[in-house]
């Protein structure tokens, strides 16, 4: 989770990272800083499920996984996933945090496993967002980038959990494009902020489903409690 800011505003508790942006800090109306909440196992958690649990090797495995997850009901029939496979940074700063599936029963199948991972990663990202929000950041919408932005199901889960519209960034090879923008602006070919906005390409906005707000609020509370309980039982 990254949030642009005109002011340098580090978190006194050290739960987020504060960086200079590529824009010059201190200029009025210009986001010269950004704050970042780091979730260590986001796409990595889905890859772990693909490789180590499902064992799927087909090129379209991720598409097949999210299509399968769409068959499961929101909330994954009570199944929760903690995505702390390599510890966690924001908000816990806990290298000893560990992942878990909790609530498994005979009624759960592959669809619930995949959806629980998507939901668990989203809960972890929301925890990072909540820290940014507590420090004064309150964006009206979420811009989703990366591989997860290609999944309509994951877009909807993010919108529902965050309670905000989601705009997926469809610009391909985002890192390479960023390097081009920085290089071009660095040699004076164009204005960085103006060109970055002009070159960005977005998909359709996904609105949150208000009927799921209560469900996901309950699941988020259970997710947070599971971390607290799991923390008292180190591996």
Language model regions located:
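Active-site core segments that coordinate phosphate-bearing ligands/cofactors
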Residues: 1-235
């Amino acid at each position: 989770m990254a949030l642009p800011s005109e002011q340098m505003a580090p978190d006194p508790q050290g739960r987020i990272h504060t960086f200079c942006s590529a824009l010059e800090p201190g200029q009025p109306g210009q986001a010269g800083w950004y704050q970042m909440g780091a979730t260590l196992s986001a796409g990595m958690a889905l890859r772990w499920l693909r490789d180590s649990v499902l064992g799927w090797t087909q090129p379209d495995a991720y598409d097949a996984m999210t299509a399968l997850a769409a068959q499961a009901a929101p909330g994954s029939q009570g199944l929760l996933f903690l995505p702390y496979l390599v510890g966690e940074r924001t908000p816990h700063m806990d290298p000893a945090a560990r992942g878990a599936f909790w609530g498994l029963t005979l009624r759960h199948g592959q669809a619930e496993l995949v959806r629980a991972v998507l939901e668990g990663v989203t809960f972890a990202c929301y925890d990072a967002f909540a820290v940014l929000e507590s420090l004064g950041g309150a964006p009206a919408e979420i811009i989703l980038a990366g591989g997860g932005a290609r999944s309509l199901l994951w877009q909807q889960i993010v919108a529902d959990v965050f309670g905000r519209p989601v705009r997926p960034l469809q610009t391909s090879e985002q890192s390479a494009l960023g390097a081009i923008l920085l290089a071009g602006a660095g040699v004076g070919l164009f204005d960085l902020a103006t060109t970055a906005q002009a070159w960005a390409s977005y998909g359709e906005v996904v609105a949150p489903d208000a009927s799921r707000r209560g469900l996901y609020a309950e699941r988020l509370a259970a997710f947070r409690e599971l971390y607290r309980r799991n923390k008292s039982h180190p591996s």
